[in-house]
Amino acid sequence: MNYFRVKIAYKGTHYFGWQAQSIDTLHEEKPTVEGTILNALKKITNYQPCTVSGASRTDGGVHARGQIAKITISQKISPEHLLLGLNSLLPTDIRILECVPSTKEYQASRGSVSKEYHYYFIASPVDNVATSDIALHLPIDSIGPDDLALLRSACRLFVGRHDFYNFSSRGSGTSFREIFYCDIHRANFSPLANDMFYLKIIGDGFLKYMIRYIMGALLELVRGRIVLDDISLYLQQHQEDKLSPRAKAKGLHLIRIEGPK
């Protein structure tokens, strides 16, 4: 068998998450990113044994610029030809960015040291049609200096090792995670939206819906519906009810996964 480590970017708008399911080959209206890559890989290998295993199981509608996956195929092929072959068969909203040889022992889904996500949102009375499927619309006039200071104060509460039971889907197993970095930035790189901001969060791992619940709490905070003490309480004690709705998937982007090569 031959093994490769690939870096993948995708726009998750039209996909039902990363993880392949049997429906990928049965119902094209419900594709997943992994399943779409696997179908392309089968064509390259003439339907010989092949597998794709990702490092992060992103939800439906979530995007990625730095997903990592391991590809296993029986056919001998160079990394360069595999990259070109996959990109020629994949839809334009999925791209293989890098492809390097790997080993049988390497497991993409294990051993990551950290993961970095960004959550993009636009604060304006009217949504921006150019970014409506990659950023959340927050229907307020603007985010001023005081709002930004408040959001950053809230972000600091999440840094460190905490029990994120209240900020995740119930039944996720152990709910302790360590956050290395959490802050709000203005997305100055975007000429399409001067009012775009993003949450940058880096941690040793994230529970299901964890970042979306954190972002949901930040949105409620800037709207004045909760206060900082509410966030502190929900980090300290298990609660019956959620502090906020979870933010929509479309603003979430997987940026980077650090781990063994």
Swiss-Prot record:
Annotated EC: 5.4.99.12
Positions with a binding annotation for substrate: 117
Pfam families recorded: PseudoU_synth_1
Reactions accelerated catalytically: uridine(38/39/40) in tRNA = pseudouridine(38/39/40) in tRNA
Function: Formation of pseudouridine at positions 38, 39 and 40 in the anticodon stem and loop of transfer RNAs.
Oligomer and partners: Homodimer.
Similarity comment text for this entry: Belongs to the tRNA pseudouridine synthase TruA family.
Name the record gives this protein: tRNA pseudouridine synthase A 2
PANTHER family: PSEUDOURIDYLATE SYNTHASE, TRNA PSEUDOURIDINE SYNTHASE-LIKE 1
GO molecular function: RNA binding; tRNA pseudouridine(38-40) synthase activity
GO biological process: tRNA pseudouridine synthesis
Active site: 59
Stretches assigned to coiled coil: none
Keywords: Isomerase, tRNA processing
InterPro entries: PsdUridine_synth_cat_dom_sf (IPR020103), PsdUridine_synth_TruA (IPR001406), PsdUridine_synth_TruA_a/b_dom (IPR020097), PsdUridine_synth_TruA_C (IPR020095), TruA/RsuA/RluB/E/F_N (IPR020094)
